[in-house]
Amino acid sequence: MSEARISVEDRGFQFADGVYEVIRLYAGRPFALDAHLKRLERSAEGIELELPLTRHQLADEIEKFDVGNAEGMIYLQVTRGVCPRNHLFPELCGQKPVPPTMLFYFRPLPALPAIDSVPAVKLQTAVDERWQRCWIKSIALLPNVLAKNAAVIAGADEAVYIDNGIVTECSASNFFAVINGAIVTHPVGKKVLPGVTRDVMLNLARDLGIQVQERPLTEKEALNADELWIASTTREISWVSHWNGKPIKPGHLGPVGRRLLEALKQHVADQCALNSTPAMASA
């Protein structure tokens, strides 16, 4: 990876004009690969970028990674390509058609912890001043970077966005509350990324007979909830222990979160065939 080269005139480098995905590998196998690639297609469509490969071709490229049975992630990024700097798309400023720049790389990650060892996270609130197209997984992540850094400086692990009193999501994860036995989370859309792990979790919850409410959630409701947790591709589920420096209940992974995490881990094992001979296969 240290030998990779990208032009200084790549639009991703100069304008953050691109989209990306992060795909978790369990024992060398990508989880929910098709869902990630479908989201990449939606993100690319959202910025009027034509992907250089079809979803099936992208899956074939990812499956070529020879990582054995390693735990880790694949980062996939597509930008609008290389051309002289201009805010206009290349085809609108007299340029010849420009091929997109696409890159993949693998990064090893520690194996995710067992259920009894799931870590807690401390959240710090941040005013949600991001744009209105958070459903696009854009490489323009400066607002998220600033929010997360401010949270860590304040002694937290992650920033949680508040939009006029409503909890939307975190700087690098989706946010969930359990209220009277129901899972409550903000609907996807302008302010919330359609997280792949989020979608898997909510479908599993419905299969388990757990009520799911996709609706706006106030900060006051969150602070009075029975359980709070966050979820993402690289972390699965982490329970929330502190909010703006103050401890919150229940002080451990609650019963609904535990039940859902058990189902998620079993689903991952089933989809990634973790008990079979190691070989990369799409999920």
Spans of model-derived segments:
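Conserved alpha/beta cores of soluble small-molecule-handling proteins
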Residues: 1-159, 164-166, 189, 193, ...
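Glycine- and Gly-Pro-enriched alpha-helical subdomains that act as flexible
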Residues: 162, 166-188, 194
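Secondary-structure junction motif
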Residues: 197-198
